[in-house]
A protein has these predicted regions:
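Metal/cofactor-centered catalytic core regions of large enzymes
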Residues: 1-160
Length: 160
């Protein structure tokens, strides 16, 4: 589905509180939060869908994925490309179906599974889990890629 504007530029950190699969609150700069809320309302009204739904999320697992141009040059292309990089945690929101209509991109996230970090600051912790460690043993060419994953994700500050 297409709509304009396709995205909202967020210049400062905005926090989203999610409860039981719904966006309960957004906090941050009042003007930016207002722009985000307006965008959600516009999209939900256009398609007759629930605006506060958080459908699903996934983190990137492709250490070779890079994006060498800027996110600002084409935000839609950026969000549909860079989500496979391990530095990116990608949420599907707005609508009760995959992938939803609005995505969130969380950069350099930490994600824990059963109390252990599977991602730490945007890097996968592959040696800490039997299944991922086994993948590195079965396909040793992956070990080098994960040891030095691509850092370029179109944001200009690519060092982590």
């Amino acid at each position: 589905k297409m709509y304009e504007p396709a995205s909202v530029q967020i210049e400062e950190v905005v926090f989203a509180e999610v409860q039981e699969g719904r966006i309960a609150d957004l906090t941050g700069n009042i003007n930016i939060v207002g722009d985000i809320r307006d965008h959600y309302q516009m999209v939900s009204k256009k398609f007759g869908i629930q605006d506060d739904n958080v459908h699903s999320f996934h983190a990137g697992i492709h250490p070779g994925c890079s994006y060498d141009t800027t996110a600002q040059a084409d935000p839609d292309r950026w969000s549909n490309t860079v989500f496979t990089n391990p530095r990116v945690l990608h949420f599907h929101t707005c609508g009760d179906y995959a992938p939803g209509e609005i995505c969130w991109m969380v950069i350099d996230h930490t994600l824990s599974v059963d109390g252990k970090n599977l991602w730490q600051d945007g890097r996968m912790c592959l040696d800490d889990f039997n299944a991922t460690r086994q993948c590195l043993e079965d396909w040793p060419e992956l070990k080098a890629m994960f040891a030095e994953p691509a850092q370029a994700i179109g944001l200009g500050n690519e060092a982590i």
